[in-house]
Every structure is written in C-alpha cells, then in structure tokens.
Amino acid sequence: MPRPGKSSYSDQKPPYSYISLTAMAIQHSAEKMLPLSDIYKFIMERFPYYREHTQRWQNSLRHNLSFNDCFIKIPRRPDQPGKGSFWALHPDCGDMFENGSFLRRRKRFKVLRADHTHLHAGSTKSAPGAGPGGHLHPHHHHHPHHHHHHHAAAHHHHHHHPPQPPPPPPPPPPHMVHYFHQQPPTAPQPPPHLPSQPPQQPPQQSQPQQPSHPGKMQEAAAVAAAAAAAAAAAVGSVGRLSQFPPYGLGSAAAAAAAAAASTSGFKHPFAIENIIGRDYKGVLQAGGLPLASVMHHLGYPVPGQLGNVVSSVWPHVGVMDSVAAAAAAAAAAGVPVGPEYGAFGVPVKSLCHSASQSLPAMPVPIKPTPALPPVSALQPGLTVPAASQQPPAPSTVCSAAAASPVASLLEPTAPTSAESKGGSLHSVLVHS
C-alpha cells in the first residue's frame, strides 16, 4: 500500500543541499542576514520534510554554516534585541551557484587564507630583517632583571649598531600593489649599497656612492614610472574591483592576473562584450568586409558622410580607409567607380533592373503567364444581351458553352460568331 501523501511529494526531501537552503533564506531576507533560528523557520515553512527530525538536520545545517567559507558570522549590535549572531553570505561567493540555480553548485567557495598567512610570515620575517632586535627589544629590556647588567649592555650595543641603515619596507598586500606603484620608490634605493659598508660607518658616507650607478637608478626610475602608469590605468578601468585578488590565485599570481586584466580589458564572461562583441568585431577585422564595401556590392548607394559615422563608431576598424584606397586605385586605372557599378566597372543596375528601382541588384526569374485577349475584343460579346434586351435561347447558349468554354475567351472567332448570331436575331425581331 503506498504511503499517504506520496503523490503530492510534500513529504519528500527537497533536492537542495543545506548550503542552498541557507543561501535561499539569507537571500530572501530584507537585510540579507538572518540569525540561526530564522533560518530554521524559513526552511520549515517552505519544506514540510524538515518539520520532522528537526534536531538531526538542524545540527547538520549548523555544521555547514560553521565549516563553509561562503557564510560569515556577524555579531549582533547592542541595540538589536535577541541573542545569537547573524549569518550572511560572503561578498565574493556570488558565482557559487551555476547560472543562479540553487540546484547545482559550481565548486566549494574557499577564502584564500594562504595569502594572509604568507603576508603575516613576510611581516614577521621583515621585522627582524629591519633590525635584529625588532621583536627582541621588549625581551632585552627585561634582561637586566634576569641577567647581569654588562651582558644586557653588550646585547643592547650589539642590537643598536646594525639598525643604522634604513629598514627595507615590508612586501605590500596583493590588493594594494597598485597604490604602492603610484609612488616612485626613492627611499628603498639606498639599502642595496648599505650592506657593503662596515657597521660603524655613518649613513652619510653612502651618498657619494649613489652617482656611481646612474644607469641602475635610471632603470629603476623608468620601471617605477611604467608601474605607476599601469596602476593608474588599472584603477581607472577596473575601479575598486581591482583591489580584490581573483578567486583561486596566490599573491604573486593575483598581482599578475590583475595586471593582465588591466591591460586586456577583461570583462566579466557575461558581459555583453564577451557575448556579441567578439562576433561582429571578428567579422569586420578578420573577414575583410567593410561596411561600405558590402553596401556597394549589394547595390545600395554609399553616402559621403558614412565615413565619419563609421570612423566614430568603429575607430579601430579601418572601414572607410580601405574603401577610399580602392576607389583611388580604380579611378587611377580608369575604371568607373560608383554605386551603380560592380566589380571591374561593370554596370549592375542596367543589366538587372531599371534605374528607378531601389532594390538590391539581383536577377529575379519571372514565370511566363498565359496570354489573354484584349479587353476590346470581349466588349461586343458582352453587349449583345443589352442591345437585344432579350436573352438568347437556352439551347444556343448551352451549345456554345458546351462546345468550347476556353476557346470563347482565347480565340478571336468566338466573339465574331456571337456577334453574328446576335445580329441575325436583332434583324428577325425588327422585321417581325
């Protein structure tokens, strides 16, 4: 016996994952964030399957919230009543679902924590590099409490002589590269010359060494200027979206991808430029069929102001340049050029259609129609009943119609016989 309610599928498990159900609830809310209790309520109101065994699936959903990076936890403000934090979707997980369908998920969204750990590791490494006592100064200040005073003084003297050279700057984050590139690195240039000096040498003696390498400094300045120009172009074209590294890339790869995106003008794959832009641009560029040439070969007149319009709409496609060059070459060779001439100066309109016709120059086959007699030949036959004021005998009409119905229309003898018969009848009536 089938289970009751089987036909309606109301008690069946919906084909959505816990991530999809949670995303539905968050997207449906006005503030785009919900506490855990409201997420449970949303699911149970819309899917009767989850009204039973609530503890089981609620535990699973709570684990999905905690272990998936696509959900972020927002603490509750003091002025908001209730308890518990809010849950919202990560700002970068917009393409997590394929074509916006909650049934299919492209891939599991992951926040790139490798970048953050790499940056923290770089900062911890750069701090001791800036001064061997960078993080050890607080401990060495406590050394007099644990060691002898002369031992602490020796350590203090050892750690304060090397920090005379200016420290190198820490590596910037990947999403702040273009901001640092806008300023030419004038300060970090002296450190490469300073390690070659003895520790006791004052930093003022490093200044005469700078003019000894003018080529390297000019090259560094040129590289910095090029990087600043590229960064300015990236900020102008991409905007604030270039601050975020692309999904699935490391710090170095993110910087390279951001630079490539700024130079190639990458659009989102859904943008209209990626859908139809590549098609018509490829036809015009690779196919070698400019607009004026197509109109010319179809027989349409090409106005003179078309060159300005096309040049303003498609400045990267030499539309009118090729037409002007071809027209100049044809005029120099003595070949007539114009809308009414085809290839090699052959007139097209005079061969195919009249000059008054504005259709494209294409030969159209015409089917032959049967020749009809002139209208004047049919008029006497039609006026016979009116002149006689009396219809002819039925036997005469039937015999004439049965004899040859088509011949009475096409042959010129049919109206003559009808006229003669009508004349004889008229004479008989007059004489009687």
UniProtKB/Swiss-Prot annotation:
Residues 203-220 have a biased composition (Low complexity). PANTHER family: FORKHEAD BOX PROTEIN, FORKHEAD BOX PROTEIN B2. Residues 163-175, 185-202 have a biased composition (Pro residues). It is found in: Nucleus. Residues 13-107 bind DNA. Residues 136-162 have a biased composition (Basic residues). Transcription factor. Residues 118-220, 413-432 are annotated as: Disordered. Keywords: DNA-binding, Nucleus, Transcription, Transcription regulation. The keyword Signal does not apply. It comes from Homo sapiens (Human). Pfam families: Forkhead (PF00250). This is Forkhead box protein B2. InterPro entries: Fork_head_dom (IPR001766), FOX_domain-containing (IPR050211), FOXB1_B2_FH (IPR047389), TF_fork_head_CS_1 (IPR018122), TF_fork_head_CS_2 (IPR030456), WH-like_DNA-bd_sf (IPR036388), WH_DNA-bd_sf (IPR036390). Its main location: nucleus. One of its GO terms (cellular component) is chromatin.
